[in-house]
Amino acid sequence: MATIPDWKLQLLARRRQEEASVRGREKAERERLSQMPAWKRGLLERRRAKLGLSPGEPSPVPGTAEAGPPDPDESSVLLEAIGPVHQNRFIRQERQQQQQQQQRSEELLAERKPVPLEARERRPSPGEMRDQSPKGRESREERLSPRETRERRLGIGGAQESSLRPLEARDWRQSPGEVGDRSSRLSEPWKWRLSPGETPERSLRLAESREQSPRRKEVESRLSPGESAYQKLGLTEAHKWRPDSRESQEQSLVQLEATEWRLRSGEERQGYSEKCGRKEEWPVPGVAPEETTELSETLTREAQGSSSTGMEAAEQRPVEDGERGMKPAEGWKWTLNSGKAREWTPRDIEAQTQKPEPSESAEKRLESPSVEAGEGEAEKEEAGAQGRPLRALQNCCSVPSPLPPEDAGTGGLRQQEEEAVELQPPPPAPLSPPPPAPTAPQPPGDPLMSRLFYGVKAGPGVGAPRRSGHTFTVNPRRSVPPTTPATPTSPATADAAVPGAGKKRYPTAEEILVLGGYLRLSRSCLAKGSPERHHKQLKISFSETALETTYQYPSESSVLEELGPEPEVPSAPNPPAAQPDDEEDEEELLLLQPELQGGLRTKALIVDESCRR
């Protein structure tokens, strides 16, 4: 008998090997299925049945599946009803891909080759897949060699687009051993913001001063480099606006407390404010004056269209460009463009001298950015204690003003100062007319103020207008004899009462529709919700008999039968001047009398709709 040829032996050995691998695979699959939850097992079996595989076989590799004909129920995704999450088609597809990857790795393990470990390592972990995206790749490059990538990015112009988020996230991922490197990495965005010729030591110093305060770093990690640069500039400019170091220590403690968490310690704060005492020096630590002027010019350009908010608001929270304060805009305009404070024109000084005393001190506190150092020292000491609550008040209620920064020299000053005067608590005697102080500084042709105060005259019957947001609330005082309060009668009643000024003429029954004149009951206490939505289905009708029986209200006809018509109308000498508590009862009396006299020509029941608001 001839010996079996070599190739046949190899073939048989390979077949045995394949069978063993298939058996091992089936065993592993069975074990995996037994560990799975029941719903997942059923899902896999259904999928295998659909693909026509035997229960032991693994599902095909995704590459071959895609090469075949398209899945017939691919279109059924559109018709799919909302069901449990694990039955969602897209989630199932993701799970299938994961399972196919697992099965492939198990196949490679089952065949005894050197490939399996490599293959398992090759399979992309979620971290690597995240690194495929450009941002992740960027952060991976920076993790490998921060200095090279920094120089490369400085060469490229696109450095400013990279935000602080990847940097901060990388810093938080680092082990404690790498903390020493953190300051140099933190300084990168600042280095990108500055001109390329600047030395890294300066930006290192910047980063170290910022690193001391974790809260500051947190805020910056949420900002893009541009915004954090603006924020830092806002801080240093706000320090520069205080004219003298000793005065700024005493008088602007409010602001310093607000920004205290940004600075390292009390000594550094003193250093800052002493630096800021001299107007010509630029207080940005470690940044050359030329670069700061470049930055400041971009800031002035962007501050052109900005609106008015408080200076503390600009310091305490990272404000977007649209919300930049009018006062910071003025400060940039006047101090940064030329590098020194703008000279005061005689017109401005006139405008200052015209103003009354409280408003002058208020203006000194509010407009401190643009005051020259000598004037500011003298006048700020006047302002003293009273300016601080005003500043806080104005910070709460400041309103965006449509004035551009160029007009701010005149109109803006007056408007802000008027705000400050209006925000003072109202005078204690409510009936006396308010003093003419608020309107004194307003020039006759000022368009903004005439638009805001249009139709509001400070007369005897009107309280001082109070501001909340953009709205003016005018509170009329009621108990003044010459101005008659608006009684809630119908318009016909009002017209009828006018002609006979000497003799009181009360409305007849036809003139009274519903007491209060609310024909659609839109402002009625009986109507709930907004009248615009509900007035169509709102039909409120009163049946006299039903009212009488159900609620025990006697109708007027029964009252008339008992009493008979009264001979004369009890007329009060001056009903509108009565106390507001008695007003409503009196109106009811006066409006019911003519009805009783007229012998009930209309329906007997009158619905009183004039409920108090």
UniProtKB/Swiss-Prot annotation:
Molecular function GO terms recorded: actin binding; phosphatase binding
Superkingdom, taxonomy of origin: Eukaryota
Presence of the UniProt keyword Protease in the record: no
Compositional bias segments (type: Basic and acidic residues): 15-33, 104-154, 167-191, 199-221, 266-282, 314-327, 340-350, 357-367
Database matches in InterPro entries: Phostensin/Taperin_N_dom, Phostensin/Taperin_PP1-bd_dom, PPP1R18/Tprn
Region of interest called Disordered, as start-end residue ranges on this chain: 15-231, 266-505, 552-594
PTM annotation (Phosphothreonine): residues: 199
Cellular-component GO terms for this entry: cytoplasm; cytoskeleton
Biased composition (Polar residues): 301-310
Keywords assigned by UniProt, alphabetized: Acetylation, Actin-binding, Cytoplasm, Cytoskeleton, Phosphoprotein
Positions of modified residues (N6-acetyllysine): 457
Extent of Pro residues compositional bias: 424-446, 567-578
Cellular compartments annotated: Cytoplasm, Cytoskeleton
Modified residues annotated as Phosphoserine in this record: 54, 125, 133, 175, 195, 224, 368, 432, 490, 530
Pfam families with a match to the protein in the record: Phostensin (PF13914), Phostensin_N (PF13916)
Biased composition (Acidic residues): 580-589
Major subcellular location class: cytoplasm
Biased composition (Low complexity): 476-499
Description of how the protein assembles with itself and partners: Interacts with Protein phosphatase 1 (PP1).
Function: May target protein phosphatase 1 to F-actin cytoskeleton.
Name of this protein: Phostensin
Higher taxonomy: Eukaryota, Metazoa, Chordata, Craniata, Vertebrata
Chain's gene name: PPP1R18
